[in-house]
Amino acid sequence: MTVSTFNRTWAKVIVNALLRYGVKHFCIAPGSRSTPLTLEALQLQQNQQAQCHSHFDERGLGFFALGIAKVTNDPVAIIVTSGTAVANLYPAIIEASLTHHKLIVLSADRPPELIGCGANQAIPQQGIFADYPIAGVNLPKPAEHYNAGWLVATIEQACVTQSQQGGVVHINAPFAEPLYEADENAINTHPWLKPIQSWLINPQTKWINSQTIQSEVSMHENWDYWRTKRGVIVVGKLPVEQGIGIKAWAETLGWCLITDVQSCVDANLPYADIWLSNNTVHQRLLQADIVIQFGGQIVSKRVNKFLEAFKGEFWQVDEYSDYLNPFAHHQTRFVAKAHHFLRVHPPLRQKPWLLEPLALSQFCAGFIEQQVGGSLNEASLAHHIEEVLATSGNLFIGNSLFVRLVDALCKLPEGYPVYTNRGASGIDGLIATMAGVAKGSGQPTVGVIGDISALHDLNSVSLLNKISHPCILFVINNSGGAIFDMLPVEAQAKEQFYRLSHNYEFAPIATMFGIEYIRPFTWADLKAKLKLAYGRKGVTIVEIKVNDQDGSNLYKSLVKQISQAEIA
């Protein structure tokens, strides 16, 4: 068998192993060295066993794969060629690692004899992602003296680890030339495949049958005591299904419930980032005996300040064993899904122990509405974000100022899917991630990002052309990084090295990539144009042009005024 043919046979085993562990999407960047992997992934697509997606920019491709992984909860494979193509995946790998979303990187490589000798496009790729992957496999150059069962077992063991822990797997696969003109008939019939033939012909068969014994969460030995005390529940980022029941549980206990915009839990105390600025309410909330936090990645600065200041009994509930303790609490940790924790900790019905947060939250609702006003700007879009969402769809929120405005100013529908990149909270790859969420879900998706984030990920606008159902990408153009207006930095330095003000507009970008574009000036204009946008296939870019400091100034003003409100 020729080298090119055996390369394909070897790659066939790799991609078929991934199928057994739920991979349904292969995201492929162009490249020659990865040809065996690419062609075998395409064979799976031809057999209707997987979908293949392509993009010319590996950084965007990684985030596109991450978006698909977020919305499907399935592992997503990424195929790239050798060299810096691999390194361009790093930001997405970091984000996926921190949020436990499942990515499998298949990086093609030069064979070992071409590493470290000046050969073209050859860099050391083993361990290139440091400790971020939960499993790394550095395969040898394809050779018949390696048992086919060994290759299957090696790939599957990495997938087993991922299925238990989430996160990223990196499989580095060297291929020697020639890479083309394989004998298509011989790829599937080589005697080397005989030991795994029954495995190959049955896509449901796994080489490694691993059964994870799930340890059930047990009721805390002192729960009967703590459920009679004064409590606060803080809900961070959670999958939709885990948030079900938390609100009713909190109401039965009579405890204060503070929810993050990523929690998918209906807030009975919305606008916490605003009302917690009031020191009187903040101090009274600190009188709680116990705080239970579900999930992590809290957006609100003032909620985090409350958590930092609290010195009582602290419980942390999260399905992963990550160390989520930025304030070094003396804590009790439950490695459990939120709804499993609720099931074994029945509430005791009590009256609410603290009414001031509810009163101030209700006051904030009207006060925010009054202060935001009727103009179309980033603050009013954040406050009324529900009005631009599809009934059944997704919301993807970028980072920097807008996610803080949404967290502080809006009240989302119970259980509405919200996606973010808050693992490392970077601004890179946001358009690509939103495109992945839209593509993976097949549902109308609204994304909202800032202008600097959009400029940072312009290449990924081309990914929006892959979406055939109605989706909306809002670009909030405040002529620079408005989040930095919050910083106490000298004006000239802030302008030149933080805000990076510009005069760019996004209509020419939409034209270049063939994307529908609108720029509304009023809410009536926006709603009329959104009705048309939801009625056609594909993505519409909506640019909201605002004064550079309006959003940050309103945010600071709301915080200041509520902080000074007198509470009886």
From Swiss-Prot:
The gene is menD. Pfam families: TPP_enzyme_C, TPP_enzyme_M_2, TPP_enzyme_N. Homodimer. Its EC number is 2.2.1.9. One of its GO terms (biological process) is menaquinone biosynthetic process. The lineage of its organism: Bacteria, Pseudomonadati, Pseudomonadota, Gammaproteobacteria, Pasteurellales. This is 2-succinyl-5-enolpyruvyl-6-hydroxy-3-cyclohexene-1-carboxylate synthase. The keyword Transport does not apply. Belongs to the TPP enzyme family. MenD subfamily. Catalyzes the thiamine diphosphate-dependent decarboxylation of 2-oxoglutarate and the subsequent addition of the resulting succinic semialdehyde-thiamine pyrophosphate anion to isochorismate to yield 2-succinyl-5-enolpyruvyl-6-hydroxy-3-cyclohexene-1-carboxylate (SEPHCHC). Binds 1 thiamine pyrophosphate per subunit. Keywords: Magnesium, Manganese, Menaquinone biosynthesis, Metal-binding, Thiamine pyrophosphate, Transferase. Pathway: Quinol/quinone metabolism; 1,4-dihydroxy-2-naphthoate biosynthesis; 1,4-dihydroxy-2-naphthoate from chorismate: step 2/7; Quinol/quinone metabolism; menaquinone biosynthesis. It catalyses: isochorismate + 2-oxoglutarate + H(+) = 5-enolpyruvoyl-6-hydroxy-2-succinyl-cyclohex-3-ene-1-carboxylate + CO2. InterPro entries: MenaQ_synth_MenD, MenD_middle, THDP-binding, Thiamin_PyroP_enz_TPP-bd_dom, TPP_enzyme_TPP-bd. It comes from Actinobacillus pleuropneumoniae serotype 5b (strain L20). PANTHER family: 2-SUCCINYL-5-ENOLPYRUVYL-6-HYDROXY-3-CYCLOHEXENE-1-CARBOXYLATE SYNTHASE (PTHR42916), PROTEIN PHYLLO, CHLOROPLASTIC (PTHR42916:SF1). The keyword Metal-binding applies. One of its GO terms (molecular function) is 2-succinyl-5-enolpyruvyl-6-hydroxy-3-cyclohexene-1-carboxylic-acid synthase activity.
